Structures are given as structure tokens and as C-alpha cells.
Design a protein with these regions (language model features):
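Juxtamembrane membrane-water interface segments of multi-pass membrane proteins
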Residues: 27-50, 68-71, 100-112, 175-194, ...
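Membrane-interface helix-loop-helix modules in multi-pass inner-membrane proteins
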Residues: 51-124, 143, 219-227
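Long, contiguous internal "core" modules enriched in hydrophobic/ aromatic residues
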Residues: 101-255, 269
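Hydrophobic alpha-helical transmembrane segments
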Residues: 155-170, 296-315
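Juxtamembrane non-transmembrane "cap" segments at the membrane-aqueous interface
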Residues: 264-286
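Short, membrane-exposed interhelical loops at transmembrane-helix boundaries
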Residues: 281-303
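Short, often N-terminal, low-complexity regions
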Residues: 345, 352-361, 365
């Protein structure tokens, strides 16, 4: 029972990470296409500025839960996917560096360099996460000892690449909707146009990915055995359709919420289709690491569940406060050189001041 609970929580942590850091990654990927001027690029940085590092808490949480609740799965996963996960790690490091270093020097060439780094450092995780999870859905060549018998190029199969493109498009759509919420004027118009342009591509990719899933994986076995699970792909489809409907009505926060629902539905569709498998072996089904043969002791799972019941709500409350505080669009006033973060503790239950989301990344004043 505890193994099942932790499997669902593990899935939820990944889903929350994809929802929250997904718009950051999508926003960074859109930077060279939508940021036409220096001011617009600064708008885009500040649309993600207060959120991106807090969002990565969920990635750390998902990795930590994998390590603590499913140590065998953690060992096999990080061994088999060592190369893509290492690239992912370096990409996230350089993304953080690009946020901090971009405006340290008053030079167009310097800023252009870090804009390029920022773009690549956001693009790479979008694709790598899709490739990694698609291969987990399909199964990877690991033996009973957990030894990986494959290569990095072996992960770049048709289904893996389809997963990479799928995740990229999913995050770009999510990021475009977020930018439309956080911007005004021409930048908002282009963000809405980007979301509208990407949406039909996303719908087509969803159909293609679901079809490929039937040929390359055994995810549908769980759904055929328990038809009630089909609510998950239907939830994803409803979220995607709802996003388009809300965009057309100009209800941007609802559109973003529907996009988040789409991401959650996609994540649960894939991972719950694997259950109880976590690392499916394509060499020998008996070598598959499951939530039951790869979990920690019952005592460990009980203690962790108690900690999670206390800490997860605290993190959610903190992030709710943060998102509420910085919920307004970024304005030109926010980009003032002397702008600063308002402490805002008293704003938790009140409407934030118009300038409470002051620029996180401004021009260097040196």
C-alpha cells in the first residue's frame, strides 16, 4: 500500500515540476523569437525571474523521493540515463548562470552571448526530459543486476525523439501562455500569436504520440485492464482543448490553468501506464524495477510520508504566496534601474502593489 502511495506521489512531483518549471523552460526557448528589443528581452527574463529557482525545488524533490523511496530505481535510472541527465544538469546550471551574469557587463555582445546560452540551456532540458521519459515508458536495456546495455545514441530512437519534440512543444505552449499573462503591448500580442500557432502543432503531436505509444510501449495494458484509467488521457485532451478555448476568450489565467491540466494529464498517463514498473527492462521483463521490488523499507516509507504531509503543504503555501505577490504583468516601471523586490510579507492576504514585482534582473548600475 505504501509503495503505491509513494508511486503516485512520485508521479505528482514530476507533474508539478513539469507544470511550474515547464513555463520557465518554454519561455527561455522563446527568447530569441519573441524578444525583438533589449527591453522586451528584459521583460521576458523578469517574467521568469521571481519563479524559476523556486520551481526547481520540485525537481530536487522528485529526485530526492526517487533516491529515498525507491533507491534501486534511483540507482538504475541514474546509471542508465547518466549521459542525458548529466547534460540536463549542466544545462540547468548554465541557465542559472545566464540569469545572473547577463547584466553584469554593459555590452551588447556580452548580453547576446548570455542570451544564446540561456536559449540553449532552456531548449536542452525540454528535449532531454522528453527523450528520457519516452525511453522509460518504452523500456531500456538493463539486466537483472541493473547494468545498462546501451548508449546515448540508443536513446535517440524514434519514440525517444518523438517524446523530445512532444515535451519541447508542450513547454513552449505553456511558456507562451505565461508570457501573455506577464507582458503587455506588442510582446503580449506576439506571445498570444505564438501560443495560437503552437497549439494545433501540439494537438497533432499528442495524437501522433498516443499512436506511437501503442506500437512502442505496453502502457495501454494497464488501461485495458482498468478502463477507468482512460480518464487520464481524456484529462490531458480536455486541458489542451480548454487552453485554446480560454485563449480565444482572452481568459489567460484560465488558459494557463488548462495548459497545466494538460501537462498533469500527460504525466500521469505515461507514468501510471508503467505501474508498477519504474525502470522497465527491454531485455528481460523479470529485470524490471518496480515500485515494490525497488522500494525502501516500510519504516522508511512511513517516516517519509509523515515528513511529506508536513513539508509539502508548507512549500505549496510559500509558492502560492510568491505567485500571488508577483502575479501582475511586468511593466516598464518594473525595469527601472533602481527597482527592488518589495518584502511584501503583509501582502500575503492583500492585493500586491502595482510595482511589487519589481525587476529581478535590471541593467548593471556599475
Amino acid at each position: 500500500m505504501l509503495e503505491t502511495i509513494w508511486f503516485v506521489l512520485w508521479t505528482l512531483l514530476w507533474a508539478v515540476y513539469f507544470v511550474l518549471d515547464g513555463f520557465d523552460l518554454g519561455l527561455g526557448t522563446l527568447l530569441p523569437f519573441l524578444g525583438k528589443t533589449e527591453q522586451e528581452r528584459r521583460f521576458m527574463y523578469n517574467a521568469a525571474g521571481p519563479f524559476w529557482d523556486g520551481n526547481e525545488v520540485w525537481l530536487i524533490s522528485a529526485g530526492g523521493v526517487t533516491f529515498a523511496a525507491f533507491p534501486k530505481a534511483y540507482a538504475v535510472m541514474f546509471s542508465a540515463l547518466y549521459a542525458p541527465l548529466l547534460i540536463l544538469l549542466f544545462a540547468l546550471i548554465f541557465r542559472a548562470v545566464s540569469f545572473e551574469f547577463r547584466n553584469k557587463v554593459e555590452s551588447d555582445a556580452w548580453r547576446s552571448l548570455w542570451d544564446g546560452v540561456h536559449f540553449v540551456a532552456n531548449l536542452a532540458p525540454c528535449i532531454l526530459l522528453g527523450v528520457a521519459f519516452a525511453n522509460l515508458f518504452m523500456g531500456i536495456p538493463v539486466d537483472a543486476q541493473g547494468v545498462y546495455h546501451g548508449s546515448l545514441l540508443g536513446l535517440l530512437n524514434l519514440y525517444g525523439l518523438a517524446g523530445g519534440v512532444f515535451f519541447l512543444c508542450m513547454f513552449v505552449l505553456h511558456g507562451a501562455i505565461w508570457l501573455s499573462i506577464k507582458s503587455e503591448g506588442d510582446l503580449q500580442t506576439r506571445a498570444l500569436a505564438a501560443a495560437t500557432f503552437v497549439w494545433p502543432i501540439m494537438l497533432a503531436l499528442l495524437v501522433v504520440f498516443l499512436i506511437l505509444t501503442a506500437f512502442y510501449t505496453k502502457l495501454y495494458d494497464n488501461y485495458l485492464a482498468m478502463p477507468a484509467l482512460f480518464i487520464l488521457p481524456l484529462l490531458a485532451l480536455a486541458g489542451l482543448l480548454g487552453a485554446r478555448c480560454m485563449l480565444s476568450k482572452g481568459k489567460l489565467w484560465l488558459a494557463w490553468g488548462c495548459s497545466a491540466l494538460f501537462i498533469i494529464g500527460v504525466t500521469f498517463f505515461g507514468v501510471m501506464g508503467m505501474f508498477p514498473g519504474m525502470i522497465i527492462s527491454s531485455l528481460d521483463p523479470a529485470a524490471t524495477v518496480t515500485a515494490f521490488n525497488g522500494s525502501s523499507s516500510q519504516l522508511t516509507l512511513k517516516i517519509m510520508l509523515g515528513v511529506a504531509l508536513v513539508m509539502v503543504p508548507i512549500v505549496l503555501i510559500y509558492q502560492f504566496w510568491m505567485y500571488r505577490l508577483f502575479s501582475h504583468p511586468v511593466t516598464a516601471k518594473d525595469l527601472d534601474d533602481h527597482a527592488y523586490y518589495l518584502p511584501g510579507c503583509a501582502l500575503f492576504f492583500s492585493k500586491p502593489r502595482r510595482n511589487s514585482g519589481a525587476a529581478f534582473y535590471t541593467r548593471s548600475s556599475s
